[in-house]
Regions:
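Phosphate/NTP-binding elements of NTP-utilizing enzymes
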Residues: 1-354
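Coil-to-beta-strand transition motifs
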Residues: 173, 358-362
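Generic beta-strand structural signal
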Residues: 160-162, 358, 370
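Metal-dependent catalytic core segments for phosphate chemistry
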Residues: 361-386
Length: 389
């Protein structure tokens, strides 16, 4: 039987096993479907389908091909969540969208399509849209992709004027601009949409402050949006960690947040990192924008190199790594451990040591205990962000 919307269709595929997703994606769709059924929020099919039709009829590929985009079911469901879930006043529920997804799954195209829709058809006169990143060069990636996307469509390109620092749509007084970090000078912004590219690479306090500045500036808009889209990365204590902590707390039921929409495409079982079925959980576009053969080749390389494996886990599995260079296999370390308690070693001879960090290093406390000719090691790591010291 036909489904009333793409959210239900995607959820049906998940629950019947036709579509392979990880636990976090399953949880968000369980939350959404339950919320629609019990009246926590409403679904506006007209708004959702309007965005989908616009993207598929006006937004073009801009690398390797120039035909119109054709959204996959997972993308149609995501667009439906962003633009179709509303409150009783028909105002969109979600103001922060956090998408974690594997490399080569169309992140930039998706972000560019969202920019195009909100610039041309969202009905916000005087909209200000920012492509944000630590450096202008990175911010320009999504910005330039958006421009190339609309450049291929005459009906859109004739309305847009590319100026020195932005793209301007006179008809709606809308400006789209790339923006590098400068939290001190961001207080005057009034964004309708902020697209944060590869937030996993945003370092420490700078990224956190810039995100909060832009988030606090959303208040003057009726239906604003911050879209953060990224693969996993290597940076600690940044906005990626913050968004991940908020997202997982929300999905576990430990948070009362209502405006955050996390779509976390990640593998569940790290030991199955080289299993194609498991990899589908982090790569919903497998077989479309990225082929299974590509993954087989990358797996073959990663199986022979710990550093390549760390990169593969990070970029294709979305399992965050502390370093791009691994010197110990995490599986080997994990299997070497035993489930023992420190309390079981009372009155034993022990030697302890601590590592007191001064900058961004890990702080650790370890103790080695000898009993019966066997050495037992207990280690505890304390990772403290600079902002908390």
């Amino acid at each position: 039987m036909p489904f009333s919307n793409y959210i239900y269709e995607y959820y049906d595929g998940i629950t019947t096993g036709k579509i392979v997703v990880g636990k976090w994606v399953r949880l968000i769709y369980e939350y959404i479907v339950s919320g629609l059924q019990n009246g926590l929020f409403l679904f506006n099919a007209k708004k959702a389908n309007k965005a989908i039709r616009f993207i598929e009829n006006f937004c073009h590929h801009c690398e390797g091909r120039t035909d119109l985009l054709k959204l996959e079911l997972w993308q149609k469901a995501a667009v439906s969540l962003i633009f179709g879930i509303v409150d009783e006043d028909n105002v969109r529920i979600f103001r922060e969208v956090f998408i974690v997804i594997g490399r080569k799954n169309g992140k930039t195209l998706f972000a560019s399509a969202v920019i195009a829709y909100m610039a041309y058809l969202d009905g916000e006169y005087g909209a200000k849209i920012y492509c944000l990143a630590p450096k202008l060069e990175q911010a320009n990636i999504v910005y330039d992709n958006f421009f190339q996307m609309i450049k291929k469509e005459p009906e859109l390109s004739e309305l847009a004027k590319k100026r020195r620092s932005d793209i301007y749509i006179e008809e709606s007084n809308t400006a789209i601009k790339p923006l590098a970090f400068n939290a001190k000078k961001s207080d005057g912004f009034n964004p309708h949409l902020v697209v944060n590219d590869e937030v996993a690479s945003w370092r420490g306090d700078g990224g956190l402050k810039q995100y909060e500045v832009m988030k606090s500036a959303l208040g003057a808009r009726r239906q604003p949006l911050i879209l953060s889209i990224s693969t996993a990365g290597y940076e600690n204590d940044g906005i990626f960690d913050e968004l991940m902590a908020r997202s997982t707390a929300f999905l576990k039921g430990g948070s009362k947040e209502r405006r955050l929409l996390p779509l976390l495409y990640m593998i569940d079982d790290v030991e199955k990192w080289n299993d194609l079925e498991e990899l589908k959980k982090a790569n919903p576009n497998m077989g479309v924008s990225v082929s299974p053969e590509f993954f087989k080749e990358e797996i073959a390389v990663a199986e022979m190199s710990l550093s390549k494996r760390a990169e593969f886990l990070c970029k294709y599995c979305n399992i965050k790594q502390n370093s791009s260079v691994a010197w110990l296999d995490y599986v080997v370390v994990d299997r070497a451990g035993e489930k023992i308690k420190l309390e079981d070693f009372k009155d034993s001879y022990a030697v302890g040591g601590i590592d007191l960090s001064q900058t961004t290093d890990l702080t650790a406390a370890s103790v080695i205990i000898e009993r019966g000719g066997v050495l037992y090691a207990f280690t505890q790591f304390f990772k403290i962000g600079r902002a908390h010291v």
